[in-house]
A protein has these predicted regions:
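"…together with the soluble PPM/PP2C metallo-phosphatase catalytic core" -> "…together
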Residues: 1-277
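C-terminal membrane-associated helical module and adjoining short loops/tails
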Residues: 6, 251-366
């Protein structure tokens, strides 16, 4: 019966998203809430950007309704209230997610200055470590084990902001943000099921369920231009914040309910966006440019510049993402040194960048 914690929120979120998305499309087109896209197919350069406004309400409804049903019929214990610390984690998490959601909506509709955006993101991210949920142990990565609060809390805040914005950067290619997030939530959901963290499991199942219709519309029906829709800044911030919360929660279980190095698997689900944002930021600094100024230097842009179609880019990035996840899982369960595992991840990433640069330059010279 525990699998109802997967099926109920998954099915409910699929139904809700399938119902809501077409109505968001209609409003976006009527109100001209669309943005140009250079990476999506020619002939479909203006795409509705408000898809992400549906995510937070669907998450709350699906998880809330599932909890009520499972607890009411005594299928699962009253998860959120068994442990006062757990209750605080989730309440602070909901508050922070609400702030991120409102920030995304304001940014998509009106635009928000960089300073205001950063202040709100810091406040929202700070709520998670203030609840007591923060990265207090790196389990030997680079020789670091227990982390003092004065370092761990700022590191956690930075990580949440980092992941939230990294996911947002993937929304230029049809299905890329949704596909990457679904893979990550599937892996994290499996880990949550393994340790019987049913509320985390419901969250992961709900996120997968609501992203399935987005992925279907943007990939399976990609030739029908008006049906495609951006997740937008709202979607990226919501997905990134939820991913951050789940990743941090599961990473803290390393050495107890999960293997010591599970932090590498959790963060390994997000290697592509995290490594890519770091590479882009370093490149901008080396070139004496503003690191917050958007450009066409992200991995999906580079693959397209190398001659790939958007669908080939999508398939390539998702396959590479799965490779990194499997590689880290094998390393963790095989008892590998986490520092060596991290260095190997970075080495694979650098080799990938060299290959992409080769084909990009080759295509430019044609």
């Amino acid at each position: 019966m525990q699998y109802l914690a997967i099926l109920l929120p998954l099915l409910l979120s699929v139904v809700l998203a399938t119902y809501i998305i077409p109505r968001i499309l209609v409003v976006s087109v009527k109100k001209d809430l669309v943005v140009p896209s250079e990476t999506r197919d020619k002939g479909r350069l203006r795409v509705p950007r408000l898809g992400g406004v549906s995510l937070f309400p669907i998450l709350v409804i699906s998880v809330g309704a599932t909890m009520v049903c499972l607890v009411k019929f005594h299928i699962l214990p009253l998860i959120a209230y068994e442990d006062s610390d757990t209750f605080v984690y989730y309440m602070f998490g909901i508050a922070g997610l609400t702030m991120m959601y409102l920030l995304g909506v304001m940014d998509d509709l009106l635009g928000v200055s960089l300073t205001s955006r950063l202040v709100i993101e810091v406040l929202a991210a700070a709520l998670i470590p203030l609840s007591g949920l923060w990265l207090d142990d790196l389990h030997g990565i680079l020789g670091i084990f227990e982390v003092p609060w004065w370092f761990g809390i700022p590191m956690t805040i930075f990580t949440i902001i980092y992941i939230s914005n990294a996911i947002t950067m993937l929304d230029d290619v049809d299905g890329l943000a949704a596909g990457t997030a679904m893979i990550a939530f599937a892996v994290l959901g499996f880990l949550a099921l393994y340790v019987q963290e049913y509320l985390l499991l419901m969250i992961c199942a709900t996120m997968i369920g609501m992203l399935i219709p987005f992925f279907y519309r943007n990939v399976m029906e990609r030739r029908i231009g008006w049906r495609n829709i951006y997740l937008g800044g709202t979607g990226g911030l919501v997905i990134g914040y939820v991913l951050s919360f789940v990743v941090i929660a599961l990473s803290r279980m390393g050495g107890t309910s999960l293997p010591e190095g599970i932090i590498m698997v959790c963060f390994g689900t997000l290697i592509i966006p995290m490594f890519d944002v770091l590479r882009v930021a370093v490149t901008r600094m080396v070139n004496h440019r503003n690191i917050f100024q958007r450009d066409n230097n992200h991995i999906h842009h580079r693959l397209i510049q190398g001659g790939m179609s958007p669908m080939q880019v999508l398939a390539t990035i998702l396959v590479v993402s799965v490779f990194f996840i499997l590689f880290n899982a094998v390393g963790v369960w095989g008892g590998w040194n986490l520092s060596i595992l991290l260095v190997t991840d970075v080495s694979f990433w650098l080799i990938l960048q060299v290959v992409i640069s080769y084909y990009k330059n080759k295509n430019r010279d044609l």
